[in-house]
């Protein structure tokens, strides 16, 4: 894989949806909990799959999971799980669907404990600031970090599913807590 394609991090290639996600969302700091919950749902769904697979089903996930409203998702029932097993807009994996409901309940508990999921996430970062890495090659970007290790360990202890350190690291990249845009990427120095 090329490090830079058309001025961008090479992982997004030339797929229009992927490029738009890279340019408009990935690595930009997210402070609102609704979007953080959306990324948590989508990143968890990605486990074992490619990100582009989930990105292409994003609107299906939005429809299936109450526009990513954690309170509504937390109230979903076994009947909802059965309904979603027949919904074409998402990956039909019973364990992942059920874990999304469980994770929503745990997400709400974290909000109550920390004031917001954003505050909870920042608690794993030195000086409570996002990390800006200075990688020049895609091969330098790690799949996890001390922050993702600690956060995923804490989340697992709380009962979260499908959110190991690698998925957690991807979540932190997506939501701008870790900026891994390559130094030569056109998005590198854009206002976050």
Model-flagged regions — what are they?
Residues 1-192:
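HhH-family (HhH-GPD) DNA N-glycosylase catalytic core used in base-excision repair
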